[in-house]
Amino acid sequence: MAILTWKLRWSTEEALSISSTGTAEHTRPANSTPRTDNSTKAIPCTPPPRKRARVYSTDQQPHSTSDPVGCDNDRHISDDNNKNQGRHTSSGDTTPIVHFKGEPNTLKCFRQRIQKYKHLFEQASSTWHWACVPGTTKNRGIVTLTYSSVEQRQQFLVTVRIPPSISMSLGVMSL
């Protein structure tokens, strides 16, 4: 008889109604039969938590540096093969680069082959291409290598044999 004293639970055809206080209550249709269970509690319906707004100080915005960026740098690009002679760099944070251009699969193989010369460059990009440029062919990819100095770049170009199907462009990049 102790089992019969358990609280009743509604049948599987029970309906869920939301009261104006924001709690969910179970209601039973008139033609359903009750089942025994102890889960007749009201379930609170609360909205999911919102993300907190980020708080920034008035001095610094997101993704900004504490040092102001200025154009007081008097360094100029001075590469003999560069067509933009005397171009002023806006930041002292530039690094020498080489763009290798060619068929994407050839560039991928070249990038794998130069892994034994890791000490002669800093970073190598994946194969990429310019989008939305009229007059370019689809089979023209680019791999970019960065160097710590112009001397390191020159040592790389002297040491590594570059296939004739790959063209290269020297330059600098702001990082």
From Swiss-Prot:
It comes from Human papillomavirus type 54. Belongs to the papillomaviridae E8^E2C protein family. Keywords: Host nucleus. One of its GO terms (biological process) is regulation of DNA replication. This is Protein E8^E2C. It comes from the Viruses. GO terms for cellular component: host cell nucleus. Its main location: host cell. One of its GO terms (molecular function) is DNA-binding transcription factor activity. Residues 15-98 are annotated as: Disordered. InterPro entries: E2/EBNA1_C_sf (IPR035975), Nucleotide-bd_a/b_plait_sf (IPR012677), Papillomavirus_E2_C (IPR000427). Plays a role in limiting the replication of viral DNA in keratinocytes. Recruits the host NCoR/SMRT complex to viral replication foci to mediate repression of both viral replication and transcription. Residues 17-41, 57-67, 83-94 have a biased composition (Polar residues). It is found in: Host nucleus. Residues 72-82 have a biased composition (Basic and acidic residues).
